[in-house]
């Protein structure tokens, strides 16, 4: 085209040539641009005769192609010869997607453009314009109605699918949430039971100590026990256990922000052992340790539902991983990875450590992510706080508590050092204290190693804050002792020790100073080891002889308080001496239970009144009597005393006490009194002198009540027995005085004439009291034996308040109050009622917020914490109180005002917040209430920033701005009330009374009493319409999918194993065979029974309601339903057995009752005077035990007792007959270890039993032994009253008969008489018995009851009808805990082979299936259990795996290729054989194989039984007297170390092999048993000889050198290293004199040393 423009400028000499050239050039360009869309329409375009251009262009929208093109046009251009000076003909053809109007418009545009372009080539410009036009009009064609309908239907379907998917996902989330919630509930329940059990164990140990050591010089027991203290110990201990919980754990670390969202829950997997895996749900972040670079998370181990802690190190690479790394950087990265691998190797040894004073490690895992390496460690979950947190909150630790901590720290540290583990970073942050006060050491060894890896320069250093302490870092075990000394010094001083060299304060006790010197001395050689420190006098102080003999009453107080609550948690425990306690009203009248909260003002303590047994909250405030703050406090306490309303926390009493405590040198306290430089051991004072106010320094303390305490409430209720306190100074006269004086008691204060000063003395009286006190102090100081210690006088104001047990409104809001609208409005109305009452009394709360609104145990509101409340009095223009007003109350009105600026920023009203000089009235509380109502109505806000933002939006001056998700129809009323309350103009804000009367509030709910009355009447008329309506509504309730899923989630855990089901079937079949040998038949009774309170008086059954409202119960046992069945069917002779489920109710709601499988065997006979049924029943259980080797190993004993003998003993001990049933319950709980001895004594005390009766009772019930040995004790009862003698004679006769019959039947178990055996005495009469063994669980020996039963003749008549006649049969029954037999068989060392069938028939193809079916039918007919494989397409490996999983020994392979033969494969003893058998001979062949297999198993079982019998007698004891030296049996320790895991029977076989081989050699050794050890290994004789080259007597380095040399010469280095480590442990740690190394492979041994 450029050429064309050039040609136009040429002269007229050659016009024809220039036109043709320009036309040709343009055509060439167009063909190149449009390609196949270009078409030359001239017939002879290449001919010699030149014709003007005529072309056709197919055009589309510009830049589009394919499915996006909806329009198209063909542009046809015919040029004249003189083109481009003459306009060409333009035509549009074959248009698509354009209307006629659009085509005409386009054509007119083209014609205009052609005229403008005349003289220039224009076809390309025309084509470009067409493309632009098409782009503008490129629209899809309009759809038909049908197409639109289909599209709409598709969209609706897609929307429905999306909604269904969202609903399904929501249900899944709810189910997962419910599962997590249930797991937490189950875990908390387990935790509660475990803590209660631990509490009982601790109390048992304390009881033993009391019996051994708590004696005064006169030989009497401690006063706390004499005064009925034991029940309180137990009850309050439980309350402590409940109230600790996980909240303390969460306070252990600083709150972690930014690490993980609270809702995140990752799943992590940890390898444990060779193949096992732990699946752990990672919970929220609970803290971080910058020093060690770790983050701590709560986690849940899914297999057991146990809570664990997850320690996580995230090692962030400085540079992204990739090919750009240098070789030096790659070397550093490889080095770090090897270091982490080394840490994992070290961790494998740490997992084995277990000690009460260290936190256990469970598993470790490291994983590489995109830009980091993440290391996770699972550790034991401890419910407690770290000593660092304790240090920051509570200050110095009292010395007696510090001594306890030190002993436990040393025990844990010594255990680590004995196992060659160095802690490396021992500090207050790495020591935890759980809810029971037990110290646990964590972060040992591995944490320091991982922290050091974090320091590598290939990692970012932002996550770790390395120590900048001036203290030197000391390594090794002595370094741990150094850090222990620093830790203890920090605890004693209340702050971290940072100075070097360490200076030990001289005011510490001398023994503690010496202890610290032994820890922090600079020379490592002089520093003591933990073993030496455990023997230090600070840990084991010498008992001091008292100067004055102390009475039991005096000695009991301190112990009593300390037993209830750790003294380090109560501010008073460290400072109040015993003498001060004796004259303190607080300690005389109250018993401290729990610290509820602390703040700048002092502390709030939960106490129990010793007289009425009720719990109260006591606020203890240190005060300065000479300060202005003290006068303000007096006025506020006076105001609070006037409040008495059901929605206001009640203030009962208030008084002041003066105490003296040791002064801290150099730092006098705020209320320090210079005159009080007397001894802390003040002499006795009269109770009336407790209030002594003296002159104090002019400087007043900081404002005490400037902020309110955030209360930590407790939901538990003390179940302690209440006893009147004796030996105290309080009397009934003082109690009467308290009642007369009203709320504020004056029993400890002189009378006051001032109306305003209800409690306090005037100045003259104060000074007089002080002078008297000084005189007394001077007089007492002359009699001091030791030099006086500097003390300071402290005055405390005690305010006794109502204790709210449940929670605060903040807790309720966070738990989702917004979901329960009715409860929300009820609580809001109660808050309004309380506020209206306060305002009516002329007061303003001024600090109203959710944490200051409490809920009691009945879920009623209690407004409390009036620390900022003030009297609503009129102020004059100068801001001073009107003197004429006095103490009178002026009613509030809109013009009333007060001055001040206090409160919490988010809740305070604008008039208070705006200016310090602003005046306000009672409506400031209504503004706060508006914020509170919004929080009650809105979902809990997750983060603090969200809460601040939302609440600040509500406080907008124009109008409240609600969140978007609050703008719906459900919150219309709430929005109206909130908007009214949050009006920034106080005049437009309602009063509490106006709002109560407003129609915006829903009507008040029906009073509970009225509701109860209606329900009572409804339930009383079971035929009425109201009753039917109520039942109908009850049974119309809908269960959500989450509830449906979690109802039985603990039963259906998804871990079904076919082997377990087969074991259960095998056990049941074995037991049934025993029963059938005695002629018993299976008989199952009806499942449900009507509720019967008398039968299950003590045991709680699972109750349900049928559609008519009748209460029925699932069977608690199988005995009662059978007795009912026998009575209703007049059965006189029957032997029956039954294996059925029994049920226990769950304490958690919406859970399936707990199912237990029980086996019952009963004999019913019309013979009344025979003991043979009882003996046969016992013998039957003996036979069951003999059927299972796993039960034979447990050495069961048979305990017998007689209900008449038990009754005779109780009557002989002076227990009235009307209290026997209660005593039976107590004794039953004691036998089943539900109660400790102390709790038993407490319950007996409640029955008003004398101490003599208890002593005599214990004398009898603790007796157990052979009948022959106990006969004299039993005969001593015959000399008593006639009734008792007859009971004893009858019971003794029965016992003698049963014992004799058992001997005749050949029962070889030990038969003992247990006079304390109590088993369902209400159901039985006659002989009762138990089969009991003792097993070790968790380092404790616990009784395990396999079976229990007895004679129950008197139970049957209780179920007979009123018209029933005829004799009553005799019945004896026994119940077997069959689940314990299942567990015993499953856990056997030698696994039991259980197969569902004898032979598996497999078809090799579809064609052979009919032959396989016929063959299976023949096997079934012959009585052979066979199974046919349905899926014939499985491979050989899959078939073999199926047989292994189902423990199938024989397989018959049917194939057409084999003709009339069948391949029989057998998988026996890890070897596979194959044989071709004729199809007709298959049945006989299989039966022969099965007979051979049964014979082999019988022989093996007999051999195992003999082996078990030998083992029971002792591994190294025999009848011939071998191994006996000087009359003492030598029983050396045998350890079997195998490269593979051995079963128990195999291990026992090796032990007996050692016994036989070495018995002569051992008999000739003159050594004690503890000096000999045998190590049995799986090594050849040549390797045993190589061990003689090891250097045993050299040091550790030389020994390791010889070990390396040995390993370099031999294979199996890992196994050899394990053997060498065990030998070294025996030599060095155990210090054994003689060691035999025995090869059970070659039956060869050598003595190594």
From Swiss-Prot:
One of its GO terms (biological process) is negative regulation of translation. Residues 1022-1493 are annotated as: Histidyl-tRNA synthetase-like. Residues 1-26, 227-260, 662-785 are annotated as: Disordered. The modification Phosphoserine is found at residue 230. It is found in: Cytoplasm. Residues 296-539, 590-1001 form the Protein kinase domain. GO terms for cellular component: cytoplasm; cytosol; nucleus. The modification Phosphothreonine is found at residues 667, 870, 899, 904. This is eIF-2-alpha kinase GCN2. The gene is Eif2ak4.
């Amino acid at each position: 085209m450029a050429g064309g423009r050039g040609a136009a400028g040429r002269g007229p000499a050659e016009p024809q040539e220039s036109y043709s050239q320009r036309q040709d050039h343009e055509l060439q360009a167009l063909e190149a641009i449009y390609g196949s869309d270009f078409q030359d329409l001239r017939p002879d375009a290449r001919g010699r005769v030149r014709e003007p251009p005529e072309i056709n262009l197919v055009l589309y929208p510009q830049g589009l192609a394919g499915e996006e093109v909806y329009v198209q046009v063909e542009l046809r251009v015919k040029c004249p010869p003189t083109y481009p000076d003459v306009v060409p003909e333009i035509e549009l053809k074959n248009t698509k997607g354009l209307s006629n109007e659009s085509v005409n418009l386009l054509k007119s545009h083209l014609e205009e453009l052609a005229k403008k372009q005349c003289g220039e080539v224009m076809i390309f410009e025309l084509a470009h314009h067409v493309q632009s036009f098409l782009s503008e009009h490129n629209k899809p064609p309009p759809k038909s109605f049908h197409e639109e309908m289909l599209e709409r239907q598709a969209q609706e379907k897609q929307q429905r699918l999306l909604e269904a998917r969202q609903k399904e996902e929501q249900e899944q989330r709810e189910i997962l949430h419910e599962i997590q919630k249930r797991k937490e509930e189950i875990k908390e329940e387990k935790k509660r039971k475990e803590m209660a059990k631990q509490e009982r164990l601790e109390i048992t140990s304390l009881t033993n100590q009391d019996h051994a050591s708590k004696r005064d010089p006169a030989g009497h027991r401690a006063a706390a026990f004499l005064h009925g203290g034991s029940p309180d110990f137990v009850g309050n201990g439980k309350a402590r256990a409940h109230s600790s919980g996980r909240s303390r754990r969460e306070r252990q670390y600083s709150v972690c922000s930014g690490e993980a969202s609270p809702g995140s829950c990752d799943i992590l997997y940890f390898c444990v052992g060779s193949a096992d895996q732990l699946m752990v749900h990672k919970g929220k972040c609970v803290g971080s340790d910058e020093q060690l670079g770790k983050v701590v998370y709560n986690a849940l181990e899914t297999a057991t539902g146990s809570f664990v802690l997850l320690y996580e190190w995230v090692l962030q690479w400085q540079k992204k991983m990739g090919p750009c790394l240098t070789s030096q950087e790659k070397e550093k990265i490889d080095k770090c990875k090897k270091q982490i691998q080394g840490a994992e190797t070290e961790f494998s040894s740490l997992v084995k450590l277990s000690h009460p004073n260290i936190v256990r490690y469970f598993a470790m895992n490291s994983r590489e992510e995109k830009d980091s390496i993440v290391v996770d460690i699972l550790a034991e979950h401890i419910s407690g706080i770290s000593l660092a947190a304790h240090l920051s909150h509570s200050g110095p630790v009292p010395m007696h508590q510090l001594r306890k901590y030190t002993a436990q720290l040393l025990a844990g540290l010594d255990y680590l050092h004995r196992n060659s583990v160095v802690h490396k970073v021992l500090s207050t942050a790495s020591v935890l204290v759980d809810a029971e006060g037990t110290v646990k050491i964590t972060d040992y060894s591995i944490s320091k190693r991982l922290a050091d890896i974090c320091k590598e320069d290939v990692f970012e250093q932002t996550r770790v804050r390395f120590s900048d302490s001036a203290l030197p870092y000391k390594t090794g075990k002595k370094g741990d002792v150094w850090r222990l000394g620093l830790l203890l010094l920090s605890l004693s001083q209340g702050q971290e020790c940072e100075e070097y060299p360490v200076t030990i304060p001289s005011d510490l006790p001398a023994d503690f100073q010496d202890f610290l010197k032994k820890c922090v001395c600079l020379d490592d050689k002089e520093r003591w080891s933990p073993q030496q420190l455990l023997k230090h006098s600070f840990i084991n102080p010498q008992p001091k002889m008292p100067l004055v003999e102390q009475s039991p009453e005096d000695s009991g107080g301190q112990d009593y308080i300390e037993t209830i609550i750790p003294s380090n948690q109560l501010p008073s425990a460290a400072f109040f001496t015993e003498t001060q306690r004796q004259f303190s009203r607080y300690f005389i009248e109250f018993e401290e239970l729990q610290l509820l909260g602390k703040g700048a003002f002092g502390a709030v303590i939960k106490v129990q009144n010793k007289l009425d047994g009720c719990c109260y909250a006591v606020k203890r405030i240190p005060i300065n009597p000479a300060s202005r703050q003290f006068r303000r406090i007096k006025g506020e306490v006076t105001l609070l005393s006037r409040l008495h309303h059901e929605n206001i926390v009640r203030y009962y009493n208030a008084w002041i006490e003066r105490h003296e405590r040791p002064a801290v040198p150099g730092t006098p306290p705020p209320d320090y009194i210079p005159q009080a430089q007397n001894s802390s051991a003040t002499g006795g004072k009269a109770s009336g002198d407790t209030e002594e106010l003296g002159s104090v320094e002019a400087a007043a303390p900081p404002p005490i009540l400037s902020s309110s305490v955030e209360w930590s409430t407790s939901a538990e209720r003390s179940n302690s027995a209440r006893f009147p306190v004796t030996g105290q100074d309080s009397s009934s006269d003082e109690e009467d005085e308290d009642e007369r004086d009203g709320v504020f008691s004056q029993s400890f204060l002189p009378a006051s004439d001032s109306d305003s000063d209800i409690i306090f003395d005037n100045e003259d009286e104060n000074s007089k009291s002080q002078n008297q006190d000084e005189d007394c102090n001077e007089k007492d100081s002359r009699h001091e034996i030791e030099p006086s210690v500097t003390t300071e006088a402290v005055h405390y104001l005690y305010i006794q308040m109502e204790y709210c047990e449940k929670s605060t409104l903040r807790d309720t809001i966070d738990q989702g109050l917004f979901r329960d609208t009715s409860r929300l409005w009820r609580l809001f109305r109660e808050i309004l009622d309380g506020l209206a009452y306060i305002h009516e009394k002329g007061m303003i709360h001024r600090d109203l917020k959710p944490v200051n609104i409490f809920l009691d145990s009945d879920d009623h509101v209690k407004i409390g914490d009036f620390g900022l409340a003030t009297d609503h009095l009129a102020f004059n223009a100068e801001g001073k109180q009107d003197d004429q007003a006095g103490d009178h109350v002026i009613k509030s009105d809109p013009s009333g005002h007060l001055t001040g600026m206090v409160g919490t920023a988010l809740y305070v009203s604008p008039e208070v917040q705006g200016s310090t000089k602003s005046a306000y009235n009672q409506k400031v509380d209504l503004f706060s209430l508006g914020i509170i109502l919004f929080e009650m109505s809105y979902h809990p806000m997750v983060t603090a920033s969200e809460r601040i933002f939302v609440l600040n939006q509500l406080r907008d001056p124009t109008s409240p701005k609600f969140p978007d998700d609050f703008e719906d129809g459900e919150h219309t009323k709430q929005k109206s009330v909130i908007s009214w309350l949050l009006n920034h103009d106080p005049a437009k804000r309602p009063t509490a009374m106006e709002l109560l009367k407003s129609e915006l509030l829903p009507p008040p709910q029906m009073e509970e009493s009225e509701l109860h009355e209606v329900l009572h009447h409804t339930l009383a008329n079971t035929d009425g319409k109201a009753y039917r309506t109520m039942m109908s509504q009850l049974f119309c309730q809908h269960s959500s999918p989450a509830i449906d899923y979690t109802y039985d989630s603990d039963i259906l855990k998804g871990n079904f194993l076919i082997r377990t089901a087969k074991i259960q079937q095998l056990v049941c079949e074995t037991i049934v065979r025993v029963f059938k040998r005695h002629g018993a038949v299976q008989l199952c009774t009806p499942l449900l029974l009507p509720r019967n309170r008398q039968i299950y008086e003590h045991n709680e059954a699972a109750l349900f309601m049928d559609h008519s409202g009748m209460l029925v119960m699932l069977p608690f046992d199988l005995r009662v339903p059978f007795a009912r069945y026998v009575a209703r069917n007049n059965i006189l002779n029957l032997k029956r057995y039954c294996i059925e489920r029994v049920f226990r109710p769950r304490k958690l709601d919406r859970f399936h009752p707990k199912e237990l499988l029980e086996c019952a065997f009963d004999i019913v006979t019309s013979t009344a005077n025979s003991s043979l049924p009882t003996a046969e029943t016992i013998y039957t259980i003996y036979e069951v035990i003999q059927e299972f080797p796993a039960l034979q190993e447990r050495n069961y004993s048979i305990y017998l007792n007689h209900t008449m003998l038990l009754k005779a003993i109780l009557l002989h001990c002076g227990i009235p007959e009307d209290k026997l049933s209660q005593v039976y319950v107590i004794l039953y709980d004691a036998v089943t270890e539900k109660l400790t001895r102390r709790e038993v004594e407490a319950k007996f005390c409640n029955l008003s039993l004398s101490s003599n009766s208890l002593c005599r009772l214990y004398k009898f019930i603790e007796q157990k032994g052979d009948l022959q040995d106990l006969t004299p004790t039993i005969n001593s009862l015959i000399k008593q009253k006639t009734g008792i003698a007859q009971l004893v004679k009858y019971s003794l006769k029965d016992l003698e008969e049963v014992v004799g019959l058992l001997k005749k039947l050949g029962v070889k178990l030990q038969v003992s008489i247990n006079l304390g055996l109590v088993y369902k005495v209400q159901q039985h009469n006659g002989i009762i018995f138990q089969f009991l063994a003792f097993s070790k669980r968790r380092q404790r020996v616990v009784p395990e009851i396999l079976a229990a039963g007895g004679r129950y003749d008197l139970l049957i008549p209780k179920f007979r009808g009123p018209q029933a006649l005829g004799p009553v049969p005799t019945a004896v029954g026994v119940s077997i805990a069959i689940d314990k037999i299942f567990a015993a068989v499953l856990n056997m060392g030698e696994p039991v082979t259980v197969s569902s069938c004898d032979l598996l028939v497999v078809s090799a193809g579809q064609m052979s299936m009919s032959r396989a079916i016929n063959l299976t039918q023949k096997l079934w007919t012959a009585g052979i259990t066979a199974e046919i494989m349905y899926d014939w397409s499985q491979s050989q490996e899959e078939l073999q795996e199926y047989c292994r999983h189902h423990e199938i020994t024989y397989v018959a392979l049917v194939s057409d290729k084999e003709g009339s033969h069948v391949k029989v494969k057998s998988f026996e003893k890890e070897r596979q054989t194959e044989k071709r058998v004729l199809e007709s001979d298959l049945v006989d062949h299989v039966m022969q194989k099965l007979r051979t297999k049964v014979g082999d198993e019988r022989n093996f079982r007999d051999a195992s039984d003999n082996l078990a019998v030998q083992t029971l007698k002792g591994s190294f004891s025999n009848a011939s007297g071998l191994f006996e030296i000087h009359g003492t049996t030598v029983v050396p320790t045998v350890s079997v170390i195998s490269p593979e895991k051995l079963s128990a029977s195999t291990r026992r076989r090796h032990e007996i092999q050692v016994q036989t081989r070495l018995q002569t050699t051992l008999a000739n050794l003159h050594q004690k048993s503890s000096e000999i050890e045998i190590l049995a290994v799986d090594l050849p004789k040549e390797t045993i000889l190589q061990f003689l080259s090891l250097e045993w007597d050299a040091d550790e380095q030389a020994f390791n050198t010889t070990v390396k040399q040995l390993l370099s010469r031999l294979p199996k280095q890992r196994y050899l290293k394990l053997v060498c480590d065990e030998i070294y442990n025996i030599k060095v740690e155990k210090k054994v004199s003689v060691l035999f190394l025995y090869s059970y492979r070659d039956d060869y041994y050598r003595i190594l040393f």
